[in-house]
Amino acid sequence: DAAAQAMSGSAPILPGATLGVLGGGQLGRMFVHEAQRMGYVTVVLEPDQSSPAGLVAHHHIRAAYDDEHALADMARLCAAVTTEFENVPAPTLQALSRSKPVSPAAEAVAIAQDRALEKAHFVRCGVPCAPHAVIETPDHLAAVQDDLLPGILKTARLGYDGKGQVRVATREALAQAWNELKQVPCVLEKMLPLAAECSVVVARGQDGQIVNLPVQRNLHREGILAVTEVHPGNVSEAVSYTHLTLPTTPYV
């Protein structure tokens, strides 16, 4: 029936319907602007009253991402819900998905917000990863192989724009860095002579059709993205690795 189609996401959500987005940042603002241009009503759930997306949405629910009353309002107002960044609690997406289509799914967001889970997911998918080790306990730290050094110690969660990352060359420096990071779960990645970092953005429809945008090359300064260039050259390898992850990554 129509309700089952809506929940499965197989029924089209036409302009005039209300779309919800969790998070009020710049990406959310871009989503809101484009949705409004297409004729949709927009709702943003974001605790910051002056957030970029909340300021331009039709409705701004100012509450925490795990506020039960706010989530009930989102479910009541919206035909479908998405998130504009990866650090929305996965249980929030899971709760909303019980009554409305949610994409990306909670399982995908849980992977994206944890570097250790992300590495394990890529390995299962057959995507080559830099040699690495997960460090969660002193025993894990002691078991790190010498051939992973020099490396970069990264917090498993919440690091961005160079934050939560420390370059280490020796075991002593590794131990000191883990202490400086408050001994939170971390991933140690071996430093490699990288030719470039690429981004592959793909979109998948409910019919399973997959389209990838032009591949981008990213240039960083001090661990922070500075320039992104679109390269039309030979990027088939990067695209193929991305497609390996899609069968087990619930994005639409």
Task: Label the predicted regions.
Residues D1-Q113, L117, D139:
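ATP-binding N-terminal substructure of ATP-dependent carboxylate-amine bond-forming enzymes
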Residues P15, P128, Y160-D161, L194-C198, ...:
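Short, basic and Ser/Thr-rich N-terminal targeting/leader segments
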Residues V43, T82, V102-S103, A130, ...:
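Structural detector of well-ordered beta-strand residues that form the stable sheet scaffold
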Residues S99, A105-V166, R171:
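A conserved helix-loop-beta module that forms one wall/lid of the active-site cleft
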Residues V168-L244:
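Internal nucleotide-binding/catalytic subdomain
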Residues H243-V252:
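Single conserved hydrophobic/aromatic residue that forms the stacking wall/gate
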